């Protein structure tokens, strides 16, 4: 999701926890959570190993915190993007947001899907965060399709969720046109 976060300098003004999360965000999203070792995060954050353990305990908690921060940012960005949109039009407007995200220069697909695909532990704390975010999206789609007055809002919401998944995955592989295609299909679904 588009991340609107100020670039933070490596200064004492920025807390070490934030520097660690900023570094993890850049590296994990770009390269993956398994490809990036703790030493790279520490070097990028200009932080000591003890700081990582003090703030996160272990890499798994850093990964979970990275995803948690991404979900909080995504929700805030989506809500801000849709704030002036009537509820009945939010489902379609959401796909405009997806198109803008897919067209952004740093787009690399869904951080949730990428991270979860790398996790072998079913009990990893990041999995619960990813699941909660997907539930949040599902609930938004149900709200938006109900407000849009479609014949079967629950089924339409599920279909829009599948379109969203396909738009993000397809845009990563084929380019942002897949997000535009998904928006076109969403308009058809919502029109009945």
Name what the model sees in each region.
Residues 20-28, 98, 141, 164:
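Short hydrophobic clusters on alpha-helical segments that form packing/core surfaces
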Residues 21, 92, 135-142, 183, ...:
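An amphipathic alpha-helix signature
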Residues 125-132, 146-190:
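Hydrophobic/aromatic-rich alpha-helical bundle segments in the mid-to-C-terminal region
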Residues 1-31, 35-47, 61:
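Basic, helix-initiating cap at the start of DNA-binding domains
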Residues 65, 78-108, 147, 157-160:
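Hydrophobic alpha-helical connector segments
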Residues 45-56:
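Short hydrophobic/aromatic patch on the recognition helix
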Residues 104-125:
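Amphipathic alpha-helical segments used for helix-helix packing
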Residues 28, 37-38, 49, 59, ...:
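Amphipathic alpha-helical segments enriched in hydrophobic/aromatic and basic residues
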């Amino acid at each position: 999701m588009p991340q609107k976060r100020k670039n933070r300098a490596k200064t004492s003004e920025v807390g070490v926890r934030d520097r660690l999360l900023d570094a993890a965000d850049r590296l994990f999203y770009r390269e993956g959570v398994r490809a990036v070792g703790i030493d790279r995060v520490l070097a990028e954050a200009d932080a000591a190993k003890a700081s990582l353990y003090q703030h996160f305990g272990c890499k798994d908690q850093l990964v979970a915190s990275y995803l948690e921060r991404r979900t909080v940012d995504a929700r805030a960005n989506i809500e801000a993007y849709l704030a002036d949109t009537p509820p009945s039009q939010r489902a379609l407007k959401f796909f405009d947001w997806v198109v803008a995200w897919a067209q952004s220069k740093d787009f690399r697909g869904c951080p949730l899907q990428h991270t979860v695909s790398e996790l072998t532990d079913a009990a990893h704390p990041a999995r619960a965060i990813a699941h909660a975010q997907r539930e949040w999206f599902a609930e938004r789609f149900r709200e938006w399709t109900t407000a849009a007055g479609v014949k079967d809002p629950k089924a339409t919401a599920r279909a829009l969720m599948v379109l969203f998944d396909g738009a993000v995955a397809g845009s990563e592989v084929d380019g942002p046109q897949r997000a535009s295609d998904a928006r076109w299909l969403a308009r058809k679904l919502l029109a009945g």
